[in-house]
From Swiss-Prot:
One of its GO terms (cellular component) is cytosolic small ribosomal subunit. The gene is rpsO. Belongs to the universal ribosomal protein uS15 family. It holds the Pfam family Ribosomal_S15. One of its GO terms (molecular function) is structural constituent of ribosome. It comes from Corynebacterium glutamicum (strain ATCC 13032 / DSM 20300 / JCM 1318 / BCRC 11384 / CCUG 27702 / LMG 3730 / NBRC 12168 / NCIMB 10025 / NRRL B-2784 / 534). This is Small ribosomal subunit protein uS15. The lineage of its organism: Bacteria, Bacillati, Actinomycetota, Actinomycetes, Mycobacteriales. Part of the 30S ribosomal subunit. Forms a bridge to the 50S subunit in the 70S ribosome, contacting the 23S rRNA. One of the primary rRNA binding proteins, it binds directly to 16S rRNA where it helps nucleate assembly of the platform of the 30S subunit by binding and bridging several RNA helices of the 16S rRNA. Forms an intersubunit bridge (bridge B4) with the 23S rRNA of the 50S subunit in the ribosome. GO terms for biological process: translation. The keyword Transmembrane does not apply. Keywords: Ribonucleoprotein, Ribosomal protein, RNA-binding, rRNA-binding.
């Protein structure tokens, strides 16, 4: 299910650098993580939805690139973010 504007605002206020931050890596990774979790739940019930599976793989790759960028530029922010999101790394 798509994010509502209220859900997006709450995610951005929690993970962004300021209230309306949408461009920082932390904000982008948090939004991608939410979309990935929603798609993962969808695919548990719709195992043969291969179009959505490909979309999921693209989202995971985009998130991986942003995480790599953050890890290369600021390790402390990277470690804090993966701890807050509960990601394995």
């Amino acid at each position: 299910m798509a994010l509502t504007s209220e859900q997006k605002k709450s995610i951005l206020s929690e993970f962004g650098l300021h209230e309306t931050d949408t461009g920082s890596p932390e904000a982008q990774i948090a939004l991608l993580t939410n979309r990935i979790n929603n798609l993962t739940e969808h695919l548990k019930f719709h195992k043969h939805d291969h179009h959505s599976r490909r979309g999921l793989l693209l989202l995971v790759g985009r998130r991986r690139g942003l995480l790599k960028y953050l890890a290369d530029n600021n390790v402390d922010r990277y470690r804090d973010l993966i701890a807050r999101l509960g990601l394995r790394r």
